[in-house]
Amino acid sequence: MSQPFRSADIRQAFIDFFISKQHTPVASSSLIPHNDPTLLFTNAGMNQFKETFLGMEPRDYTRAVTSQKCVRAGGKHNDLDNVGYTARHHTFFEMLGNFSFGDYFKQAGIGYIWEFLTSDEWLAIDKNRLYVTIYETDDEAFDIWHKDIGIPSERIIRIGDNKGAPYASDNFWTMGDTGPCGPCTEVFYDHGADIEGGLPGTPEEDGDRYIEIWNCVFMQFNRQKDGSMLPLPAPSVDTGMGLERISAIMQGVHGNYEIDLFVHLMDAAAEILEIENQQQSSLKVIADHIRAVSFLIADGVTPSNEGRGYVLRRIIRRAVRHGNKLGADSEFFYKMVAPLVAEMGTAYPELKDKQSVIENAIQKEETQFAKTLAQGLRLLASELEGLKDGDTLSGEAAFKLYDTYGFPVDLTADITRERGIVIDEAEFDEHMQAQRERARDAGKFDVDYSSVIQVENPTTFIGYEQLEEEGVTIDALYQDGNPADSLTEGMEGVIVLDRTPFYAEGGGQVGELGEIRTASGVFEVQDTKKSGQAIIHYGVVTMGDISTKQTADAQVLSSIRAASAKNHSATHLLHAALREVLGDAVTQKGSLVSSEVLRFDFSYDKPVSTAEITRIERLVNEQIQANTPARIENMSIDEAMKQGAMALFGEKYGSDVRVLTMGTGSIIDGQRKPFSIELCGGLHVKRTGDIGVLKITSESGIAAGIRRIEAVTGMNAIKNIQQSEQQLSELASQLKVKRPEVAQRVRTMADKQRELEKQLERLEQKIASAQAANLLDDVQTIAGTPVLISTLSGIDGKSIRTLMDDIKSKLPDSVIVLIGDKDEQLALAASVAKSVTAKVKAGDIIRHLASELGGKGGGKPDYAQGGAPKAANTNAVVNALPAWIADQLG
C-alpha cells in the first residue's frame, strides 16, 4: 500500500482486499439496531448479521466485508466517561470486519488476517511486532499460526478461562447463555519497549505497549442449556478491527487522537474556538463527540430525556461544557459538522445528505443548554467550595444539577474528577428513584413470544392477492411460548402454518385478524407476527381442538384488511405531502397502521401550523381524488434507489425489494415524477381513490424534534367530519352566533377572561399587602431570632413571593415562613436572613415542611419555595414548626 496511510485509504484498502477474496461489500447498518432490544446502539460489526449467524435470516452471499459505524455510550457498553482521558477510548468508532457464513473457517480466516497486515501489497506491518492470542485448547489455531504462518511459538499466547467459569475467557466468545459460540484469536501490535505494559495474560497487560488490533471469532459450537457444546453444522467466522487503532499504527503514532482524522477535527475545533494550545484534552472530547453526535442524528436519533435521545443529549452537553472550559461563550459545536463532513462524508454520504439537519439539531440543543449552563456551573462551584482532592460531593447537589440545570450526572462527574472529587452516587440514586421507576414502567412491553419461538421451516406468505387459503398445514403449535401437540377450547396459543394469507406486523402495519378452521376446531386469530422466516398467528381456540399436522383453512377478516390497506396507502401519501410542504429534512421516525386509524411520526423541530396542516391534507386528498393506480413492482434494491424510492425508518431490506408507486408529482428534468415512491412490503389499495378521503385529526409533539400526525380515512373520516360539524353547530347555538362567527366570538371571550384574571391578580396582591401589615403582630422570638410563621388563605405561589418581599423589608434579620392556602393547595415559602443561615437554611425548612405534608420543594439557604396538597395534618405540621426551628437554632 502506498504512502500516505490516511484513515480513508486504510478503510478502502480493507474493503478492496476482501473484495479480491470474493467477499460481498455490505454497507454499514444504522446505529439504531434493527429488532434487537438487547442493544442501545450498534456496537460491533456482527450486529447486523446476528440473525444470519443464528440461521434465521439467510443471505444471498456467504462472505461479507463491512466498515461498521459503532457507538459505545450508555448502557452496558459505555466509554463516555473515559473519552478525553485515555489514548484509545471513543464514543464513536469504525469497526472493519470480514465474515464467513458457513464458508471458510480457521485456515483461510487466519491467512487473510496475516496477508492483509504483513504483505507488501497491503499494510506491510513488521511481522516481528505482531503477537497473537488463542484460546487455551485451540490447538488447530496454534498450528495454523505456528506451522503455516510461521509465527514463533513464544509469540503465540494461550489464554484460558480467566473469568471464573468454563468457557468464560477473553478468548472464547459467546452470543448468550445458549447458542452459537467459539474460540477467538486476537492479533496484538507491540508499540515498543519505551512504552509501559506487558503481554496479554500477564499482570501488566493493561499497559499501552501491546495493543489489540484484530479479533477473529470462530463460531464452531452451539452451547446447550446444560452447558454442553455441540459442533455447528456450518462453522462461521466473525472478525473486527478498529480503524482508529490500525490507523495509528500505519501513521507511526501511539494514540488514536494523533491520527489524521482526529488531528483535522481538533485543528478545526481550535480554529473555531480561537485557541492556540492544541494539546488539551477538551479538544479530544470535542473531536470525538462530534462524530458520535452527527452519526446518531443522521441515523434518526434526536436529543430527548429518555433512551437513545438522552444519551445523545449527554454527549452534546459534555462537548459543550468542554468548549465552555476552553473559552466558548456562544454556540460553537454545530460548526464542527462541516469539518466532519469534509473528512467522512465521502465514505458515509448520509452525513452530506443530513448536514443541515445535524447542524440545526446540535445548535438547538446548544442554545437550550446555554440557558442553564452558566447557572449550573456557578452552583457546582459553590458546592465544591471548601472540598479538596479525595472529598465527596453530595448526591443531593448532583441531583439538583440534573433536575434543575439539565446536567447529566456523568457531566457533573466529569467536572468533579478534574479536581479529584467523587460524587455520592448512592445518595444521587435515592433522589433519582422516582424517575427510575417511571422509566421502568415506560419500558414494559406486553408478552411477545415472537422472539423466543424458534421455527425451522419458513412460512410462505400468499396474502398479497388473496384473503383465504384452503388446505394449509399446521406446522407447529405453541402455548406460553412452549411447543404443544394440541390446543383445546378456551386455550390461548400460537399457530404456525406452512403458508398463510395473514399479513404479519411490519412496516408499521398491525398484524391481521381472522380464523383458522380444521375438521376438529376453530382458532380465532387475534394478531399475526414474524419470528425469523416464520409467520406466527396469536389467538384462542373458540371451538373444539386444534392439533399439529392437521390440514386447515385460513381466512383473513376482509373488512379489517380493506380498512388497513386504505390507511397504509394513505400513510405513504401523507409522508410525501409532509416532505413537499415542510421540506426534505422531514424523515419518518415511526408509524402505526390499523383498520381504525393511521399514525405517522416524523422529524421536525417545531409544531406544524394550521395552514400547513390544511395544505398537507389538501395535497393528499387531491391525490385520492385523482384515482390513479397504486403500482407495485419487485426489483433490486439498487434499481429502487435509482428510481428515487424512499426506505421506511427502522426496516431492513434484502437485495430484492417491493416498491409502491402512487400519484403524480412534479415535472423534474422533463419527466413527470410520481407523488410517492417507497419501499414497502405491506398491503395497499388498487387505486388511490379507494382510500375515499383523509382527515387529519391531530398533530402533536411526542419528543424533542419529533412530531406526530394522526388521521383517519374512508368512512371513519366521514364520521369525524360529521362529528366536527355537529360540535360546531352546537357551539354556535350556545354562543348565539352563526357558525362562521364562532371563532371570533371565542377570541373575544378569551380576551375578556384574560383581563378579568389580571384584575383578580391585582386584587389578590392588594389583599396580600393588607394581610402583611397585620402579620408583624405574630412575630415570636426563638433563640434570640425573630421568627414569623403564618398561614394565609386565598394566597397562591405567585402572590406569596410578593408578600414575602414586603415582609422581609420590615423584618430584616429574621426567619419567615409563609403558607398560602388556595384551592386545596398549599404554597410554601421560607426566607432566612444571611446572618442566620449558618444555623438554619430556608431550603431545609421547605424540605422539612414538604416532606411532612406530602409535597416537594427546595431552594437556596436564604430563600426557598415548595408546594403540597392540603391535608388533614396541615395545622398540626404548621403548629409543630416553631419547635423544629428552635432545634435548628440551638
From Swiss-Prot:
Keywords for this protein: Aminoacyl-tRNA synthetase, ATP-binding, Cytoplasm, Ligase, Metal-binding, Nucleotide-binding, Protein biosynthesis, RNA-binding, tRNA-binding, Zinc
EC main group: ligase
Name listed for the protein in its UniProt record: Alanine--tRNA ligase
Functional summary from the UniProt entry: Catalyzes the attachment of alanine to tRNA(Ala) in a two-step reaction: alanine is first activated by ATP to form Ala-AMP and then transferred to the acceptor end of tRNA(Ala). Also edits incorrectly charged Ser-tRNA(Ala) and Gly-tRNA(Ala) via its editing domain.
Pfam entry (one): tRNA-synt_2c
A single GO molecular function term of this UniProt record: zinc ion binding
Annotated disulfide bonds: none
Cofactor entry: Zn(2+)
